[in-house]
Amino acid sequence: IGYRLRGQDQIVRSIEAVKRASRLGVRGFLVYDEGCPLVLDQARKAGAIPSDCHFKMSAHAGVSNPCSARLMETIGLDSINPVRDIQLQMLSAIRQAVDIPIDIHTENPASSGGFIRHYEVPEMIRIASPIYLKTGGIVAGTHSWDTTAEQARLRAKQVALVKRVIDEYYPDALASSKGSISW
């Protein structure tokens, strides 16, 4: 089944956590459950949480086709992470179905596949922009563990490697300007 909120109590708790975090200035939230963003978007529209809160669907939710991606956009998500091993033609079909940004993993920790997709990145940009590239995951042995200072340096190296591939194979690609992502 994957990560999901179990029961209405967990929905309420997650909404309260978003309210509290937003009072502390947090504006970006990663969600795992399809029901939660539906309610969070309604709360955002009603003014119960700030209108500039950004909700992103986790790759763990299994978004892997245009219909599920469109559903995510319809329920108020601001961006989606499709499954990590999504094929390029599938990614292209998702882009045709939604207007929201897509977050795409360029690599993964060994515990969730351990693959590296750096040479696919230029094509990902061509077919799926606007996209956010999620790079550096291969450095982590497992998903969602704390990052050491050394792993942070290695993650930065992975970012530089992806940037080199983009510069070499798609030099006309445009990056978001610094500060353009406000959440």
What are these regions (language model features)?
Residues S64-S68:
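Short, glycine/polar-rich helix-capping loops at beta-to-alpha or helix-loop-helix junctions
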Residues I1-V26, L30-V63, N81-P82, L88-W183:
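Active-site pocket-lining/capping segments in soluble small-molecule metabolic enzymes
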Residues S22, E73-T74:
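Non-catalytic positions within long, well-ordered alpha-helices that form the structural scaffold/packing
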